[in-house]
């Protein structure tokens, strides 16, 4: 995989420039020793290859993490989108490209642009791997629920459940995706006007690392209380969403709902 980030490419080029200088130095120093020069050159090339790839990957991961922080920590989807929108097109490799499109899709989803989130998600190619298939299906289901296309969301949720059941040899992934699937099923139930397992969802709040994920759960709980016509609890939950929602659609939705009550 070649990194889509300019800093990574610059580091890659710098490493190989140093390697070329080292090779020139080796041959100038050992003009009369052909075999040692060849061996030293091969070692320098191998060293350059592994060093450049390692440095490129480190910088690429750092840049991706920084940009995802705009979304998951700063709760600013527009800032994330503007910094990441060109990355998927520059990414090589089907797996990496699918992941990058899923990241961008989550940015559009957090901004409330569900059509673009779904459109962006479909640009990636799932390749039958457990992690990519479940990533694609869970993100698609989430967008469909939030957009209000509930029948299709239910079909995708069933497909996700079957795909999770088929996972073998990676119990950690299976358990994690099972939790994701259950939260989505509760969101779908709340969206349909049914009751949800609030106790379970409140437990998931404590275990959810990212703030976007917490908003998703609060959103489900708020809809549950709305369905139950428990205005006091609903307003308490909406107030939390308004306070923690940053620049996401969750906050705007909570503000509009609070104005209605």
Across the structure, where does each feature detected by a protein language model lie?
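N-terminal alpha-helical membrane-insertion module
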Residues: 1-77
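Helix-turn-helix repeat elements of alpha-solenoid scaffolds
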Residues: 36-42, 69-85, 106-121, 149-162, ...
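N-terminal topogenic membrane-targeting module
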Residues: 48-127
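Solenoid-like repeat scaffolds
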Residues: 51-57, 85-96, 122-131, 158-174, ...
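TPR repeat positional signature
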Residues: 63-67, 84, 101, 137, ...
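Residue-level signature for tetratricopeptide repeat
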Residues: 69-73, 90, 107, 143, ...
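Long, non-transmembrane cytosolic or organellar matrix-exposed soluble domains/tails
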Residues: 190-261
